[in-house]
Swiss-Prot record:
Involved in the modification of secondary bile acids into iso-bile acids (3beta-bile acids) via epimerization of the 3-OH group through a 3-oxo-intermediate. Catalyzes the reduction of 12-alpha-hydroxy-3-oxo-5-beta-cholan-24-oate (3-oxo-DCA) and 3-oxo-5-beta-cholan-24-oate (3-oxo-LCA) to yield isodeoxycholate (isoDCA) and isolithocholate (isoLCA), respectively. It holds the Pfam family adh_short. Belongs to the short-chain dehydrogenases/reductases (SDR) family. The keyword Lipid metabolism applies. It catalyses: 3-oxo-5beta-cholan-24-oate + NADPH + H(+) = isolithocholate + NADP(+); 12alpha-hydroxy-3-oxo-5beta-cholan-24-oate + NADPH + H(+) = isodeoxycholate + NADP(+); 12alpha-hydroxy-3-oxo-5beta-cholan-24-oate + NADH + H(+) = isodeoxycholate + NAD(+); 7alpha,12alpha-dihydroxy-3-oxo-5beta-cholan-24-oate + NADPH + H(+) = isocholate + NADP(+). NADP(+) binds at residues 70-71, 97, 162, 166. GO terms for molecular function: oxidoreductase activity, acting on the CH-OH group of donors, NAD or NADP as acceptor. It comes from the Bacteria. Its EC number is 1.1.1.-, 1.1.1.393. This is 3beta-hydroxysteroid dehydrogenase. It is an enzyme of class 1 (oxidoreductase).
Amino acid sequence: MNFGGFIMGRFDEKIMLVTGATSGIGRAVAIRAAKEGATVVAVGRNEERGAAVVAAMEEAGGKGEFMKCDVSNKDAVKALFAEIQEKYGKLDVAVNNAGIVGASKTVEELEDDDWFQVIDANLNSCFFCCREEVKLMQPSGGAIVNVSSVAGMRGFPSAAAYVASKHAVSGLTKAVAVDYATKGITCNAICPAGTDTPLTERSSADIKTRMAEIAAQGKDPMEWLKNSMLSGKTETLQKKNATPEEQAATILYFASDEARHITGSIVASDGGFTTY
């Protein structure tokens, strides 16, 4: 039943993992999925925010729990999935959402630490999780949705590490789809553009700093900004950012049984940002 935009019962009896679940898009996914019947394992690093997500899921009439994990740490990820296996015995849906934007720098400006911080948070975390997810899903199938970015579909200035990591997530998504299609596992990537989340706010602050640096070099910061990854609401056809709830609706469609025939797709959820 569709109730106020929610599809009640869509995820009944499903065990769903959501990483990066304590804020932004991940939080919206966890709350809506719980409302639609899933038992949600909300994963993040902040216990206080994790408890708040669980409370929000329960307030929405759903159920779930918080499991603390740094998903960029392969041993921590193995321990996380061992706990899920022991407690639930299966995994039906996984939304790999954890990630960062990182330093706004060109290739020559990036230090090694800048690079590896973003690769660990965005790509390695997704790989570590996918590797464990397919093991738990293979007996009965499942759905994996990786949250990539429009930066996984095109390039942007001063975002070398982020663009590389998100293109790699899109590639990993296709590889998983190819390897596990006959085992009943779908794997798709959603590529948001501007979305009103704490991550976007932090990135916007970093971009303001970057614009000041460009101006100090005698260059036009507005020329740089209009091509940047976070160039603002006016750069989408819809002239607005998405809400986390709008992105969650798209993600959960691909996580649902309604999308069983879709796999290996890299889907722009970007208000038309990548059409021009």
